Amino acid sequence: MKPEDFRASTQRPFTGEEYLKSLQDGREIYIYGERVKDVTTHPAFRNAAASVAQLYDALHKPEMQDSLCWNTDTGSGGYTHKFFRVAKSADDLRHERDAIAEWSRLSYGWMGRTPDYKAAFGCALGGTPGFYGQFEQNARNWYTRIQETGLYFNHAIVNPPIDRHLPTDKVKDVYIKLEKETDAGIIVSGAKVVATNSALTHYNMIGFGSAQVMGENPDFALMFVAPMDADGVKLISRASYEMVAGATGSPYDYPLSSRFDENDAILVMDNVLIPWENVLLYRDFDRCRRWTMEGGFARMYPLQACVRLAVKLDFITALLKKSLECTGTLEFRGVQADLGEVVAWRNTFWALSDSMCSEATPWVNGAYLPDHAALQTYRVLAPMAYAKIKNIIERNVTSGLIYLPSSARDLNNPQIDQYLAKYVRGSNGMDHVQRIKILKLMWDAIGSEFGGRHELYEINYSGSQDEIRLQCLRQAQSSGNMDKMMAMVDRCLSEYDQNGWTVPHLHNNDDINMLDKLLK
């Protein structure tokens, strides 16, 4: 049974309830040494699953449909989330940007690998299906399925960080590779990382990162779609921040960890049969190497990523202001200056998202892609911004981040609460319950294990720090922007030499130069 078969209507995406039912498929997920029977009810995953379900439900709310949805282009007569359909103009991209933002606000920007993230992959398939050669029809079919149903995809494109100094063939027992070809499809084995939130997705796209070394053995040159319930597909999950929050605290203590934890996992494939209809590239080094630059996904996903980060920074900016109100330092000049810098970073990413849309460029088959320069700028600046903002919070909120009781339970103990009311109250009349609530939210955002993972996530979101900078340089060179900048400097250099100005509109200084007179 396909995931989309759980829908009561074929002319719309999943509802939240249908999405949750579609995950109850016997998938092989492991955490804390045990296999998970049902990710929708297991305390390590259930609130994250419910948070994703909330996104699907929003697609069917009359008050949100205009901002989130439009008609499909597949002939189904139905509707879909706007970012699931190939943009045909800059204005389309602007509408898609706004839909991404609306969805992201439901998780306050804290869920990054929501279904719209990999919708960019679906649109890449629909925009240039011919790129996939003999598997062109597969690309078309997947675009249709993803768009019409709102299928939840993730990807696993990074090889495990084992012996990276060795050639690929020397680590062939680790990396995903072809085991054999059959009439039904290909059989593959190996592992990929980091499969973020894949426990809650329908499918995983298996491919390559832009900086990945592929080696020379074509058995590694594969790209395909793996169902999460396929025999032999296994996820080994990291510790669940959601489960830890539930076991040791309450929503008051961990308001983000307890519902927005996108669990990262090791994806293992043990002799998995991938049907031919799921194969996109097969033993094809040429296309695997060209996919990042020509496949479209690398030009599409940064729009979702940048908007999601901008929403997150809206939240963090306001939360920082509230935190400073708690401590009574908001009116200090230096503190306000730092808050202003956070606002500037927030403005930067919204402005970049504007530029991605307004400066969009035609691609192929009538499709449009976000502006390349803006998206490359986002990829370089995002890690810098997040680390700087976290540092600003730590320097300004200081001990307020940990000057907190251990649990909401302390507030329910009259012997302790009387002291908390006096010594842990907020400033300007704020009571202790509200102060603790605000600062526990801030701690969960930046200081808890959940918060630490988010810093790591934002810093490494787009991959190698060197590579994203090199790609920014290459874009400037290939677009002609570097040539224009160089030409401007060359023009400046040509306007003078060791003897003076070489352009007719400027006056040489022979008549006023004092050195000429002094040295005679």
From Swiss-Prot:
Enzyme's top EC category: oxidoreductase
Q: Which Pfam families match?
A: HpaB (PF03241), HpaB_N (PF11794)
The gene name on file is hpaB
Name the PANTHER family on file. 4-HYDROXYPHENYLACETATE 3-MONOOXYGENASE-RELATED
Organism from which the protein derives: Escherichia coli
In its miscellaneous comment, the UniProt entry states: E.coli K12 lacks the oxygenase component HpaB.
* Keyword annotations: Aromatic hydrocarbons catabolism, FAD, Flavoprotein, Monooxygenase, Oxidoreductase
The record's listing under NCBIfam families reads: HpaB-2
Task: Tell me its family.
Answer: Belongs to the FADH(2)-utilizing monooxygenase family.
EC number of the protein: 1.14.14.9
Is the keyword Flavoprotein assigned to this protein? yes
Q: Does the keyword Zinc apply?
A: no
The protein's name is 4-hydroxyphenylacetate 3-monooxygenase oxygenase component
Pathway stated in the Swiss-Prot or TrEMBL entry = Aromatic compound metabolism; 4-hydroxyphenylacetate degradation; pyruvate and succinate semialdehyde from 4-hydroxyphenylacetate: step 1/7
Single Gene Ontology BP term? phenylacetate catabolic process
Q: Quote the Gene3D superfamilies the UniProt record gives.
A: 4-hydroxybutyryl-coa dehydratase, domain 1 (1.10.3140.10), Butyryl-CoA Dehydrogenase, subunit A, domain 2 (2.40.110.10), Butyryl-CoA Dehydrogenase, subunit A, domain 3 (1.20.140.10)
- Protein task: Utilizes FADH(2) supplied by HpaC or by another flavin reductase, to catalyze the hydroxylation of 4-hydroxyphenylacetic acid, leading to the production of 3,4-DHPA. Can also oxidize phenol to catechol, and hydroxylate other phenol derivatives.
The recorded induction information for this protein reads: By 4-hydroxyphenylacetic acid.
What InterPro entries has UniProt attached to this entry?
Answer: Acyl-CoA_Oxase/DH_mid-dom_sf, AcylCo_DH-like_C, AcylCoA_DH/oxidase_NM_dom_sf, HpaB/PvcC, HpaB/PvcC/4-BUDH, HpaB/PvcC/4-BUDH_C, HpaB/PvcC/4-BUDH_N, HpaB_gammaproteobact
